[in-house]
């Protein structure tokens, strides 16, 4: 008998259906030589400090730092019943093999391993690693089960991340709460993210707008604008020197080619859903996860934007169908070397036969965007003709740039998501030396623009790129930044939940509480560079290049140093 453990009931039932295990029991399904059960997210959590020593129930600076020799775990209260069911099933004599069917990623691996360890199970483990919940993908996955030990390094990385978060949260939060007599929460990823939001707010608050001027000339069907002029008297003199005509000094034409972007990873999907639909990062992740479990899209928690080369035939034949595509894009989109644990997010083949009206509108929007993005990624380039007309008066240049679309290329798939304003500006045919008759001239007063507050779109991009200036350019992009594609939405929501950040329409603003925290926290624990470096090291642990123990020792050393610094200053 084989026991299959999935991450959620809905996923377990989909797997059970494929395995023809149809006999429903309390907390599992049985049949055809399988028992299929499920976790309910994280059944096991790290214990709080008072589980190690009752004195830690009170927050005292004298007790810091807290570095357990062995970390304790406990079953969450809400999931005790399901854990008991899993423990009983795992230790039944009839079960000889456990199949880990939790989500194929770092957190999915951790969810299963912690249950397996807490249940004191010693049985053989196999790993189901799939990127789609389609029946065909599940069958294929079960025919190629991997040995569970292949993912030991992935679990070590998950453990290291959880322990690092615990160490920073339990020690640094207590340190500042004790020092300032206020309940502060410091997080390994959360606090550097908050620091970016606070810094942007500070830049906006202290921004001093600068006034400048331009002279605008309206001629036959278009207008020419001068360069920026800082002095109003100089701008007035220029306007007064302009007569009823102006001579064209230069006309340049060039063709601009824009290639399409690659299909979505989770971060780019979240960014575009925020930009186009106003969805939060968490909403997009929830909608995508639901679409995955309904077999409409492939695994969403991916950091890859390419597809594997063995997917070319099925994608071209079944998803692209009769739609025209650029064969020259094949090598860009289908590149196995650029795929990590999972390929880019695309629609499943079976979803193309489904009625989208059965989906909630929010999920249908996300699905259509994913489908259109895939079509666009394999589309032809956008080709535009750019014409720049320049005229001069008293050494000042006036110019206008026109744009005409020659071939719309991939943009035909993305028209629904673009601004409605005209993207073309057609200029009349003019040549160098031509005399243009002016209809009017106008002096315009303008101001330099302040930086914009972060939206979830721009914050996700900033989190993805944070700390990269400190990292060797040869390092893969997916190993940089604050958090991972799967965790960034939770970080943003947590900042809002804890009162450090608030939403103002699409903007994310730091609260007084958030600003106060960043004011007092040491640079090391609010630095994007530090956290990006730690994220790289976690990736190295997952690939077997770094040890969990060495990583955690370095973090303990940083915490010890900070605690002693404050203790000695009191």
Model-identified regions with their sequence ranges:
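Amphipathic alpha-helical transducer elements in NTP-driven molecular machines
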Residues: 9-16, 33-36, 40, 76-87, ...
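Structured, non-catalytic alpha/beta "coupling" segments that mediate domain-domain communication
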Residues: 25-56, 191-234, 375-426, 554-564
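Conserved short loop/turn motifs at secondary-structure junctions
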Residues: 1, 101-104, 181-183, 253-262, ...
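Basic, low-complexity terminal or inter-domain segments flanking catalytic cores
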Residues: 2-3, 90-96, 118, 173, ...
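Metal- or metallocofactor-binding catalytic centers and their adjacent structured scaffolds
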Residues: 232-264, 270
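Intrinsically disordered, low-complexity regulatory segments
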Residues: 1-162, 166, 450
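C-terminal or mid-to-C-terminal helical accessory/interaction module adjacent to the motor/catalytic core
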Residues: 71, 84, 93, 135-219, ...
């Amino acid at each position: 008998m084989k026991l299959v453990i999935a991450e959620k009931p809905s996923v377990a039932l989909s797997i059970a259906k494929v395995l023809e295990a149809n006999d429903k029991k309390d907390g599992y399904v049985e049949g055809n030589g399988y028992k299929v059960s499920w976790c309910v997210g994280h059944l096991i959590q790290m214990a709080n400090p008072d589980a190690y020593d009752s004195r830690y129930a009170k927050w005292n600076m004298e007790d810091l730092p807290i570095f357990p020799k062995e970390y304790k775990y406990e079953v969450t209260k809400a999931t005790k019943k399901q854990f008991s069911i899993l423990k009983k099933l795992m230790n039944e004599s009839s079960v000889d093999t456990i199949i880990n069917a939790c989500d194929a990623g770092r957190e999915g691996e951790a969810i299963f391993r912690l249950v397996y360890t807490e249940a004191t199970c010693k049985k053989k483990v196999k790993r189901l690693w799939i990127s789609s919940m389609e029946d065909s993908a599940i069958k294929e996955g079960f025919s190629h089960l991997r040995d569970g030990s292949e993912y030991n390094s992935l679990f070590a990385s998950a453990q290291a991340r959880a322990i690092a978060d615990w160490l920073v949260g339990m020690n640094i939060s207590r340190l500042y709460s004790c020092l300032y007599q206020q309940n502060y929460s410091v997080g390994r990823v959360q606090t550097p993210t908050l620091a970016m939001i606070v810094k942007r707010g500070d830049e906006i608050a202290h921004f001093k707008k600068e006034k400048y001027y331009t002279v605008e000339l309206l001629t036959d069907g278009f207008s020419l604008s001068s360069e920026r002029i800082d002095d109003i008297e100089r701008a007035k003199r220029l306007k007064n020197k302009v007569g009823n005509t102006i001579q064209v000094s230069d006309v340049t034409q060039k063709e601009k080619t824009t290639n399409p972007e690659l299909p979505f990873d989770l971060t780019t999907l979240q960014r575009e859903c925020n930009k186009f639909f106003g969805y939060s990062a968490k909403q997009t992740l929830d909608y995508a996860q639901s679409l995955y479990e309904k077999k409409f899209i492939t695994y969403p928690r991916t950091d890859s934007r390419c597809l594997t080369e063995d997917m070319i035939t099925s994608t071209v034949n079944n998803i692209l169908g009769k739609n025209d595509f650029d064969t020259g894009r094949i090598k860009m989109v289908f590149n196995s070397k650029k795929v990590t644990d999972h390929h880019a997010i695309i629609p499943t083949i079976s979803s193309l036969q489904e009625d989208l009206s059965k989906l909630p509108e929010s999920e249908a929007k996300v699905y259509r965007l994913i489908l259109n993005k895939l079509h666009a990624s394999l589309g032809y380039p956008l080709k535009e003709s750019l014409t720049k007309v320049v005229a001069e008066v008293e050494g000042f240049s006036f110019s206008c740039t026109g744009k005409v679309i020659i071939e719309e290329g991939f943009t035909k798939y993305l028209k629904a998501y673009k601004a409605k304003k005209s993207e073309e500006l057609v200029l009349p045919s003019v040549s160098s030396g031509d005399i243009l008759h002016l209809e009017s001239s106008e002096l315009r007063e303008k101001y330099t623009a302040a930086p914009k507050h972060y939206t979830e779109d721009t914050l996700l991009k900033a989190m993805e790129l944070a700390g990269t200036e400190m990292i060797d350019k040869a390092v893969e992009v997916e190993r940089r930044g604050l958090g991972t594609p799967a965790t960034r939405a939770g970080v943003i929501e947590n900042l809002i939940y804890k009162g450090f950040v608030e939403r103002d329409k699409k903007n994310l603003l730091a609260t007084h509480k958030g600003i106060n925290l960043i004011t007092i926290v040491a640079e090391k624990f609010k630095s994007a560079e530090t956290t990006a470096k730690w994220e790289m090291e976690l990736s190295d642990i997952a690939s077997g290049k770094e040890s969990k123990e060495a990583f955690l020792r370095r973090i303990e050393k940083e915490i010890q140093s900070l605690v002693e610094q404050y203790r000695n200053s009191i």
